[in-house]
Amino acid sequence: MDYKERLIQEQKELKEKCEKLQIMLDKYISGTLDFTPNCSYDLLHEQYIYMMNYLSVLSYRIKMEVK
């Protein structure tokens, strides 16, 4: 697998993780999580923001690198 394929794979995996974290955050707010997190909503939300920013950068890189 070359670096372009790895970029695309990383983007796919990160997108899935972002989607799952968003679902978790929605459940956290609505009080429907099936477990009690040890960290705050704010910390998880901050993680989500950083992950989404990284996804944006990664997507831009892919547009530039993969043609």
Positions of PLM-derived features:
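Extended, charge-rich alpha-helical interface modules
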Residues: 1-67
